[in-house]
Amino acid sequence: MSKAAQLLGEQILALNIGYLTSDKEDNELYTPYYAVDHIVKYLPKGKIIWLPFDEEWSAFYRRLTELGYRVVRSSLAEGQDFFEYEPEHWDLIVSNPPFSIKDKVLERLYSFNKPFAVLLPLNSLQGKTRYKYFKDGIQILSFDARICYHNKEHMDSVVKGSPFATAYFC
């Protein structure tokens, strides 16, 4: 076997191990700071950013307030359900919504008719349900590698082996 074929085989095996060992059941994956930093340069200062799925300790909330952005946040834990609650004043949404309800989230986002940037799996581009939203155009801000998210058990470090690629859908 050639060295190139062996290397390719090792890379495929590494991807499979990452997929097989990652937690695909937990719907709560938290965004690391480097993924927030990726979107910051595209966010206008002076606008109010709504973080609809964020606690005070989230990387989105901490980084954006640290950088002087005007931020309003809400969370289900505080009785503010994204599908029923809307802050009085806001200009755009930035978030990492629960992937398992992405269709419902997209429907609500488009109903506002305001700008948004949400992290979603890249395969979210596919599907008849989402086509009605994306047919007139969608902007994608992608990463050069898969995001390693945090989960409840690993808040001080990232969890390696994400089973999917994610990007900002804008």
Label the model's feature ranges:
Residues M1-C170:
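Class I S-adenosyl-L-methionine-dependent methyltransferase catalytic core
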